Structures are given as structure tokens and as C-alpha cells.
């Protein structure tokens, strides 16, 4: 083998054999003799050195993405009540309303632009506010309803005190109360309208030129004007100038109690031609004259489905 003058040649011969690991190296340097190096097998690993000191703390990594929310835990115990807060400032005063400026009748409400039938507050002559049903649809509107029967949901066979104060429900049947009716009908001349319906779908009415009841000292005596007409006919005039009677106060002209005998409360004479506060018997009935009767319309053996008594200031 020829060797260049300025080159370094390394000839490496590696011999691998099972169980052997020598490696023979022959080096030939220009101008020197050949040098042969024989490398032996690696020795056994030395013992582990001592543990090095901990390195300096690295920079904190960036926060990872939020994990999936866990399930809601059970409700904890109720906490103690907090301290009472500071009282708020007084609000602005609402629009003033008094008996001097407030409406006195449903007719007055109608003239003020209240055209829907419903419950309104009016003011009686003694300044008492009174919630009343205003019929704004029938015969020109402006009627104050003081009696209504329509489904038998309210018991009308009651005592003197109940009729004095009034009873029933705004959602159904009611009697406005004799004291209230007296106050309403002493403000001036009020006309009366009685609206009736039967269970066959027929409707009719009776109308009177004036209607007033006196105070309790006069036993709520009825003062009735002329019958003006209506298909229901006149079944109230015979009760004119009669006193009001209930099951516990008999003021009629009969030797027996008309209120007890006909299960009602009315301006009975001897005894009646109308009994609109009688038993709610739902149409034809075999019993005599103890239903919601108006003799001139359906007779003594037919109890009306609906009756409404209402007044309007003229």
C-alpha cells in the first residue's frame, strides 16, 4: 500500500467475534514508524456518584385551559339572616283623589272616558270609597249594579245585618248592601233598570223612572217611580212604599213572615209579585213563589237564570 507524502492514513481493522471485543488500529505517520494500538474491552460500570444539587427554579409555565365544570354539589345550609337594610327614600306622591274630586257614580265615570264594564271605586256623600260594578254597555251605560244573580254560587237567604252591609263576590253574585244602596240613591234622582234572563236564552227588562230606599231607621223603605216599560213587565210597583224584610226581621204586611215563607229578603207586602233574592232554583220549579221570581215575566214557578238590578243618576 502506498502512502502520500503529506497525508495521514488510518487503517482500522475491527474484528467482531462472539465473546471478543478487541479493536486493532494501525497508524502510519509520515516519517515515523508504524504504531499499533490494541483497545481492550470496556470495564465494569463504576459506582453511582453522589446526587447533584438541585438546579435553580425554572420560570413558571403559562396557565392551561380551564377544565370541564364539575357537577353541582348539594345545597348548603341556609345562612343566617342578614342585617336590616337602610330604609329607602320616600317615593313621590300619587295623584290625589278624594270624595271632593273623585267620581260619585258610574255615570260620572262614563263621562270621564271609562267605557269598559267592570269594578270601579266611587265616593259616597259621606266620603266613603265604595267599589262597585259599573255596567257601561247596557242602555247607554253608566249603571251602578247593586244586585246580581247568575249561578247560585252565593246564599241569599241571609239575615238583616248581611243585607245591611252587603255580601257576595265580585266574580259572581252579590248584594251591594242596603246602607250603600241608600247612600247611592239619595244623591239625586236615580232611575232603575231590572235585567232578567231565563235558561232558554231569553232576555228582557223592566225600567222605572226613579228608585230610592230610605235609611235603616225607616227599615230601608222602597220609594219607586213610574214603570217606563220593558218586556219583563211590571212586578215591582206592588212593593212600592213597603219596608225591607229578612228572615230575622219581619216588616211585611202579612200575618206570617214572607221572608221565611218564600226564602228571600225583599220589600214584601202580602207577600210578593217579585222575589229576586229568593232561592236559585234553575228554571221551572214545583214549589210556589220561592225562587228568583218575576211574576209578570215567567210567573211564580220559574226561577230566573240571571237577574241584575241597577241604578243610574238622571
Swiss-Prot record:
<dbReference type="GO" id="GO:0046597">
    <property type="term" value="P:host-mediated suppression of symbiont invasion"/>
</dbReference>
<keyword id="KW-0391">Immunity</keyword>
<feature type="disulfide bond">
    <location>
        <begin position="99"/>
        <end position="127"/>
    </location>
</feature>
<dbReference type="GO" id="GO:0001867">
    <property type="term" value="P:complement activation, lectin pathway"/>
</dbReference>
<dbReference type="InterPro" id="IPR036056">
    <property type="entry name" value="Fibrinogen-like_C"/>
</dbReference>
<dbReference type="Pfam" id="PF01391">
    <property type="entry name" value="Collagen"/>
</dbReference>
<keyword id="KW-0176">Collagen</keyword>
<comment type="subunit">
    <text>Homotrimer. Interacts with elastin. Interacts with MASP1 and MASP2.</text>
</comment>
<dbReference type="GO" id="GO:0043654">
    <property type="term" value="P:recognition of apoptotic cell"/>
</dbReference>
<dbReference type="GO" id="GO:0032757">
    <property type="term" value="P:positive regulation of interleukin-8 production"/>
</dbReference>
<protein>
    <recommendedName>
        <fullName>Ficolin-2</fullName>
    </recommendedName>
</protein>
<keyword id="KW-0732">Signal</keyword>
<dbReference type="GO" id="GO:0034394">
    <property type="term" value="P:protein localization to cell surface"/>
</dbReference>
<feature type="binding site">
    <location>
        <position position="250"/>
    </location>
    <ligand>
        <name>Ca(2+)</name>
    </ligand>
</feature>
<feature type="signal peptide">
    <location>
        <begin position="1"/>
        <end position="17"/>
    </location>
</feature>
<feature type="glycosylation site" description="N-linked (GlcNAc...) asparagine">
    <location>
        <position position="301"/>
    </location>
</feature>
<keyword id="KW-0430">Lectin</keyword>
<dbReference type="GO" id="GO:0006508">
    <property type="term" value="P:proteolysis"/>
</dbReference>
<dbReference type="InterPro" id="IPR050373">
    <property type="entry name" value="Fibrinogen_C-term_domain"/>
</dbReference>
<feature type="binding site">
    <location>
        <position position="252"/>
    </location>
    <ligand>
        <name>Ca(2+)</name>
    </ligand>
</feature>
<dbReference type="GO" id="GO:0038187">
    <property type="term" value="F:pattern recognition receptor activity"/>
</dbReference>
<keyword id="KW-1015">Disulfide bond</keyword>
<keyword id="KW-0677">Repeat</keyword>
<keyword id="KW-0479">Metal-binding</keyword>
<dbReference type="GO" id="GO:0005576">
    <property type="term" value="C:extracellular region"/>
</dbReference>
<keyword id="KW-0964">Secreted</keyword>
<dbReference type="InterPro" id="IPR014716">
    <property type="entry name" value="Fibrinogen_a/b/g_C_1"/>
</dbReference>
<feature type="binding site">
    <location>
        <position position="254"/>
    </location>
    <ligand>
        <name>Ca(2+)</name>
    </ligand>
</feature>
<dbReference type="InterPro" id="IPR002181">
    <property type="entry name" value="Fibrinogen_a/b/g_C_dom"/>
</dbReference>
<dbReference type="GO" id="GO:0005886">
    <property type="term" value="C:plasma membrane"/>
</dbReference>
<dbReference type="GO" id="GO:0002752">
    <property type="term" value="P:cell surface pattern recognition receptor signaling pathway"/>
</dbReference>
<feature type="disulfide bond">
    <location>
        <begin position="258"/>
        <end position="271"/>
    </location>
</feature>
<feature type="disulfide bond">
    <location>
        <begin position="106"/>
        <end position="134"/>
    </location>
</feature>
<dbReference type="GO" id="GO:0007186">
    <property type="term" value="P:G protein-coupled receptor signaling pathway"/>
</dbReference>
<dbReference type="GO" id="GO:0097367">
    <property type="term" value="F:carbohydrate derivative binding"/>
</dbReference>
<comment type="similarity">
    <text>Belongs to the ficolin lectin family.</text>
</comment>
<dbReference type="InterPro" id="IPR008160">
    <property type="entry name" value="Collagen"/>
</dbReference>
<dbReference type="GO" id="GO:0001664">
    <property type="term" value="F:G protein-coupled receptor binding"/>
</dbReference>
<feature type="domain" description="Collagen-like">
    <location>
        <begin position="40"/>
        <end position="96"/>
    </location>
</feature>
<comment type="function">
    <text>May function in innate immunity through activation of the lectin complement pathway. Calcium-dependent and GlcNAc-binding lectin.</text>
</comment>
<feature type="binding site">
    <location>
        <position position="256"/>
    </location>
    <ligand>
        <name>Ca(2+)</name>
    </ligand>
</feature>
<dbReference type="GO" id="GO:1903028">
    <property type="term" value="P:positive regulation of opsonization"/>
</dbReference>
